[in-house]
């Protein structure tokens, strides 16, 4: 393999290096000298690392690795010298400079967790709970849903991680009560066994429990969900080749969400020791993990901006557009599209109660371009999603401008 050759680029003070919304993200930058300021059109939450970057910091990685439009604008605060890294050079960068690659991955992981907590607060009006004691609440939820295998697994893990917990005795009683209904449940796997199989509706891990492994899906599908205020919130359905569980491994923090086999599946489990070895031996895997984290960050930023749309119908149209952009569907073309979720999940995405969501969906269905087919949302022309989203965004901007103007009127 040829040695890694990175280019140095210079920008004068005041220059715009990347611009939010532009779809030209084919490289990211590491600051060698000088300072750069990041800004966003819609600033929902303050970034943990701040908006001023210096030598050793990097920017543009999210959009470059995810293949989406830029989510921020970068402007030189002084004359700057930057190291330019093209997307296809990232695997080489991992092999030649593992510390830089790990810095990117660790920062991304922290960023995902931080932004996900902010999104939970804004959409679900609740704080995320990342503590083993929460496992009991998860177990109680699934028991009430008559999903006894999931409940038994969660009760078992609550006792495992909180043996002296205030609900330990109650958890044991619950386990005895539902034991007759348990079918083909496997509670533990050999930690030395990298390839593992899980039957449909089996719990792989529970939110709130410690985690020291990430998983790569070899076959099947996995549902990522969390229980908030006695409701299950679907976060994602992952397919073959996807990676999950990496944040707990990288940060040594409790699982932020639970993982359940959506279909019969086979997973490869990677522990910390194996992960360190893979950084050098399998740079493509680390590049894939970086891409995955970048896609999550991009998606959460879009979802955070969605929370600022006042009209619930506008939020729904925007949520559909986000999903189309996520799948890289060109909404400038007249094509049909079947979403892999229905009205209930769409209401959940925009933080509406099921009853409120049904009313808004009925209003959406008055537009003949939209239908519900086999409990999935179907659109006859994806351009209509873009048109409706643009309309509601324009109305939002006009309303904001009107309020700002009225607040600055001077009365004599």
Each language-model region and where it sits:
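Alpha-helix N-cap/N′ positions at the starts of helices
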Residues: 9-12, 85, 127-137, 196-199, ...
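Cyclic-nucleotide recognition modules
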Residues: 48-105, 236-290, 298
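TPR-adjacent "capping" and linker segments in tetratricopeptide-repeat scaffold/adaptor proteins
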Residues: 117-134, 187-188
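Charged, long alpha-helical assembly modules
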Residues: 166-214, 226-227, 232, 237, ...
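Regulatory nucleotide-sensing modules
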Residues: 1-41, 178-231, 240
């Amino acid at each position: 393999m040829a040695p890694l050759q990175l280019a140095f680029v210079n920008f004068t003070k005041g220059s715009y290096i990347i611009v939010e919304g532009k779809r030209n993200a084919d490289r990211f930058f590491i600051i060698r000298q000088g300072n750069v300021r990041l800004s966003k059109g819609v600033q929902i939450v303050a970034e943990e690392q701040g908006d001023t970057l210096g030598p050793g910091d990097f920017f543009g990685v999210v959009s470059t690795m995810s293949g989406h439009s830029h989510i921020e604008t970068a402007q030189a605060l002084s004359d700057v010298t930057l190291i330019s890294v093209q997307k296809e050079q990232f695997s080489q960068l991992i092999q030649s400079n593992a510390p830089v690659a790990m810095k990117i991955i660790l920062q991304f992981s922290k960023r995902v967790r931080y932004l996900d907590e902010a999104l939970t607060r804004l959409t679900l009006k609740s704080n995320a709970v990342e503590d083993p004691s929460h496992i009991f609440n998860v177990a109680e939820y699934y028991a009430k849903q008559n999903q006894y295998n999931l409940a038994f697994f969660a009760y078992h893990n609550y006792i495992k991680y909180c043996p002296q917990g205030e609900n330990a005795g109650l958890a044991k009683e619950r386990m005895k009560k539902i034991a007759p209904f348990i079918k083909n449940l496997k509670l533990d796997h050999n930690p030395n066994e990298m390839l593992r199989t899980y039957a449909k509706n089996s719990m792989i891990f529970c939110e709130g429990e410690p985690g020291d492994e990430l998983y790569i899906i070899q076959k099947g599908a996995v549902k990522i969900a969390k229980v908030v205020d006695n409701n299950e919130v679907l976060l994602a359905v992952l397919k073959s080749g996807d990676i999950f569980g990496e944040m707990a491994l990288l940060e040594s923090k409790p699982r932020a969400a639970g993982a359940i086999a959506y279909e019969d599946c086979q997973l490869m489990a990677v522990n910390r020791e194996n992960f360190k070895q893979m950084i050098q031996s399998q740079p493509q895997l680390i590049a894939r993990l970086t891409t995955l984290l970048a896609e999550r960050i991009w998606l959460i930023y879009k979802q955070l901006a969605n929370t600022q749309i006042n009209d619930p119908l506008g939020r729904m149209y925007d949520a559909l557009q986000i999903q189309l952009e996520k799948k890289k569907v060109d909404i400038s073309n007249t094509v049909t599209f079947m979403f892999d979720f229905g009205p209930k999940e769409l209401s959940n995405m925009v933080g509406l109660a099921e009853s409120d969501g049904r009313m808004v969906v009925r209003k959406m269905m008055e537009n003949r371009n939209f239908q519900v087919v086999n409990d999935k949302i179907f659109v006859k022309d994806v351009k209509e999603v873009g048109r409706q989203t643009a309309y509601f965004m324009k109305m939002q901007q006009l309303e904001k401008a009107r309020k700002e103007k009225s607040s600055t009127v001077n009365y004599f």
